[in-house]
Amino acid sequence: MLDKIIRIATRQSPLALWQAHYVQHLLQANHPGLQVELVPMVTRGDIILDTPLAKVGGKGLFVKELELALLDGRADIAVHSMKDVPVAFPEGLGLVTICEPDDPRDAFVSPHFAHIDDLPAGSIVGNSSLRRQCQLRERRPDLIIRDLRGNVGTRLAKLDNGDYHAIILAVAGLNRLGLASRI
């Protein structure tokens, strides 16, 4: 197995690359001498940023290209965030392993407010998760919830540019990218 190169399909976002490098490290730590290379890809979900996910295909938008790379032999494995993995897989593919989970909490991120309860009525909060939107509407029906797409850096830039009063992101993603100070 040491003469074979394991190719990992991954999205090109900084967080996806972090996760793929993490799996690369685990594989090489457990199999010294194993060659592992990343195969970064752009998915439809990375390209279509101006439409809510539910309207353009949902979670599958982020994995289709990775699945095709596995099926046509350009990659041997794919690394992806579990939250975006579809329930059903194409024939010939499946879920082989799950890494130990990181912090599952959501993070409230705002340059001016310390807590969601500090936001004035009518404040604009961004996120792209239907689950988070429902939770926000239940807790604070007086807030304006707007879809927010893009990688973590893009979302933080939109917040910093004043497009939103606050955004909700995954704690794990912020930690992995060295951005815990934004919480």
Swiss-Prot record:
Keywords: Porphyrin biosynthesis, Transferase. The keyword rRNA-binding does not apply. Its EC number is 2.5.1.61. Pathway: Porphyrin-containing compound metabolism; protoporphyrin-IX biosynthesis; coproporphyrinogen-III from 5-aminolevulinate: step 2/4. The keyword Translocase does not apply. Signal peptide: none annotated. Its cofactor is dipyrromethane. It catalyses: 4 porphobilinogen + H2O = hydroxymethylbilane + 4 NH4(+). GO terms for molecular function: hydroxymethylbilane synthase activity. GO terms for biological process: protoporphyrinogen IX biosynthetic process. Binds 1 dipyrromethane group covalently. It is an enzyme of class 2 (transferase). Monomer. Belongs to the HMBS family. The porphobilinogen subunits are added to the dipyrromethane group. Tetrapolymerization of the monopyrrole PBG into the hydroxymethylbilane pre-uroporphyrinogen in several discrete steps. PANTHER family: PORPHOBILINOGEN DEAMINASE (PTHR11557:SF0). This is Porphobilinogen deaminase. The lineage of its organism: Bacteria, Pseudomonadati, Pseudomonadota, Gammaproteobacteria, Enterobacterales. The gene is hemC.
